[in-house]
A protein has these predicted regions:
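Structural marker for long, regular alpha helices in very large eukaryotic proteins
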Residues: 1-653
Length: 653
């Protein structure tokens, strides 16, 4: 009969009628070693009669696999009526706590049955869902009405059998946790592991997981276990989807599931991906997979809930900076293979951090009057070590899992802002001081400046430290007559001009400090304008104009260029040919480039000729020096200048 129901859907109605009349109720108690019963009345199982034993044997021998498959196929039937009747049979004859399911069937068969049962939620039919919850959460039972029931020893109803396994403080949530939680989670994970390319099949476990959240007793336990597997499955499908339409269909289901999950759980998992020991450099493949998953999650799913923006994203930014610092300061940089893995991880961390900084609003770092903390607490926060900060973040998310309401964040809004700036500045310093970190300098300065723009009220620890590091790097190179890499010089120019141009710029860098470094920077940039060195011409010219944009009224860059062009070894005030050729490069790129974009910081009320004055303040004196070569230079030099003038456009706007 079981086989007929499994293999022939048309016979399931008849099989159901037979089962309703002849299937024994398999709701006996669990064997004594699993019973949690203070009275111990049922520990020996004396009430199992010979008739019940015979009935059980008749449907479960030689093994109960056929019984399970009969129910599984019935629960997956296309007809709602058949699904409903099989669910009724589960509730009345084969509850989750029955010894058949808990003792006699294999774990795979139990997963099969539970997976088939929860599959009915796809239909969104309330009558099916009610029966499913009754089966997963156990039958209702009023303990007081059965406390003195003398007949309970001889005939255990499914209600009393269920409650015999619990103490007086048991609940439906405990029932599900003990009997249904593990097989349900395993079943959903098995569905996710199938890696189907069909959009309908792929999204099925997502929709099931979403529907399970309708009951907190089930969803509250299952969702934390399947959340990351669902997101990983979605990430994998993006690479194997046959078309964008297929991925969009699957992503809609994944996105609906994601939107139903608590923000604290989402970010608890994200922080775990970054800070957890399982994602350490000792397991590089796992670490990179976790970082890529975090990137996918943050770039594809909705991250704009207020709690996410103001509480969780700042903590995640801080977690990323802590991870980057740990990778950079590791003693393993010189070990084979470490630097390449760490560099890839740092690139991924940088892209995620920049994505988050674009998302987070300024109000996330603005103190709230109703949540104000004592300034001494903020001072204590900013003096915490990285290990203490990491522990505080992990403890916060650990507590959030055990609480219905979000606990108090580990840091105030200004406190977390200050620590973020401290760590971001520390990473910039590492790039300046370490030869192995130079490649990340520009990216880290970009991030640091972007963070400063979002944290206007935060205090930067040791604000002069970054300027001092840049100054030392540049002056050491100039004193040693060495040329720094373009990435370092470019980053230094960007850092100085950006820090000076932020609101309340005097907090970070003064105009006097910039003027002190302009001659050194111009000297470095001028070497990149060699005619043969085509690679860096555009970048060097852009940097010179960027320096000019913050100092143009005082002609500082113009004076520095003029000084570099005039050879100190001669008494002549004319530029030699090699310096003139560098000026030709600067002039050409100044003419063809949009140099006006660097004048955005100039006042708009200085009259109609402001652009002309702005340009002239950089190019005039060096141009006069070059033109002087027409009369006082050597024949070759004069010829070179004439050729350059001849090739110039007839007008220069």
């Amino acid at each position: 009969m079981f086989l007929a129901s499994v293999t022939n859907p048309s016979r399931r109605v008849g099989a159901l009628a037979y089962l309703n009349h002849h299937l024994p109720k398999l709701a006996g108690k669990i064997p004594s070693d699993d019973i949690v019963n203070e009275t111990g009345d049922y520990e020996k199982g004396e009430n199992r009669t010979h008739d019940m034993t015979s009935a059980l044997e008749s449907v479960t021998s030689p093994e109960p696999g056929l019984l399970i498959r009969c129910f599984a196929t019935g629960l997956a039937d296309e007809q709602v009526l058949i699904q409903r009747n099989f669910l009724d049979l589960l509730v009345t004859h084969l509850p989750l706590h029955s010894s058949v399911l808990q003792r006699r069937v294999t774990s795979k068969d139990l997963e099969l049955l539970v997976g088939a049962a929860v599959g009915v939620v796809i239909r969104r039919d309330m009558s099916l869902n009610r029966r499913l919850w009754a089966w997963l959460l156990g039958p209702d039972f009023d303990k007081s009405s059965h406390a003195n029931d003398a007949g309970v020893h001889n005939s255990m109803s499914s209600s009393s059998a269920a409650m015999a396994t619990f103490d007086n403080n048991s609940s439906k949530s405990h029932y599900f946790e003990q009997f249904g939680f593990k097989p349900l989670v395993s079943s959903v994970k098995s569905m996710l592991a199938k890696n189907s390319s069909n959009p309908n099949e792929r999204s099925r476990p997502y929709r099931i997981s979403l529907s399970l959240m309708d009951r907190w007793e089930v969803g509250g336990l299952v969702v934390p276990e399947v959340f990351l597997p669902v997101i990983r499955s979605t990430q994998r499908y993006k690479h194997i989807a046959k078309s964008k339409a297929s991925f969009d269909e699957v992503f809609r289901s994944a996105s609906a599931f994601f939107d139903g999950v608590e923000s604290s759980l989402i970010f608890s998992e994200l922080v775990g991906l970054i800070l957890s020991p399982r994602s350490s450099i000792s397991r590089p493949n796992r670490m990179m997979d976790d970082l890529r998953l975090a990137t996918f999650m943050l770039s594809h799913f909705n991250m704009k809930e207020e709690e996410m923006l103001t509480t969780h994203i700042p903590l995640l930014i801080l977690s990323l900076l802590l991870k980057a610092k740990a990778l950079c300061t590791s003693s393993a940089w010189n070990e084979p293979g470490y630097s390449s893995v760490a560099s890839s991880a740092l690139d991924e961390i940088g892209s995620v951090a920049n994505l988050l900084v674009r998302l987070v609003p300024e109000r996330a770092f603005t103190p709230h009057p109703e949540k104000s903390r004592d300034s001494s607490m903020d001072n204590a926060t900013t003096s915490m070590s990285n290990e203490q900060v990491t522990k505080a973040i992990l403890n916060f998310y650990s507590r959030s899992k055990d609480s219905l309401r979000l606990p108090e964040p580990p840091f105030s809004s200004t406190g977390v802002a200050t620590i973020i700036l401290r760590e971001a500045q520390s990473l910039v310093m590492l790039s300046l001081e370490s030869d192995t970190q130079t490649q990340f300098l520009r990216e880290r300065i970009n991030l640091f400046v972007a963070l400063l723009s979002k944290m206007q009220r935060a205090e930067l620890p040791e604000p002069g430290k970054l300027y001092e590091a840049i100054e030392e790097k540049l002056t050491t190179a100039n004193d040693g007559h060495s040329v720094l890499s373009m990435s370092v010089v470019n980053s230094a120019v960007f850092a100085l001009t950006s820090l000076y141009s932020t609101k309340k710029s005097s907090r970070y860098i003064s105009y006097e400090q910039i003027t002190d470094l302009i001659p050194v920077l111009v000297q470095q940039l001028w070497d990149f304008l060699e005619p043969a060195n085509l690679r860096f011409h555009v970048e060097a010219a852009a940097c010179l104009w960027l320096l000019h944009s913050v100092s143009w009224r005082d002609h500082l860059v113009e004076a520095a260029i003029t000084s570099v062009m005039i050879s100190p070894s001669t008494s002549s005030h004319q530029a030699p040919l090699d310096q003139a050729e560098k000026f030709f490069v600067l002039w050409n790129h100044s003419h063809h480039s949009n140099t006006d974009s660097f004048a955005l910081r100039t006042p708009s009320d200085d009259g109609p000729d402001i652009k002309t004055v702005y340009r002239a303040n950089l190019l005039s004196q060096p141009l006069f020096n070059v033109l002087g070569l027409l009369s006082s230079g050597s024949e070759d030099t004069s010829l070179a200048v004439r050729d350059w003038l001849r090739d110039l456009p007839s007008t220069y706007e």
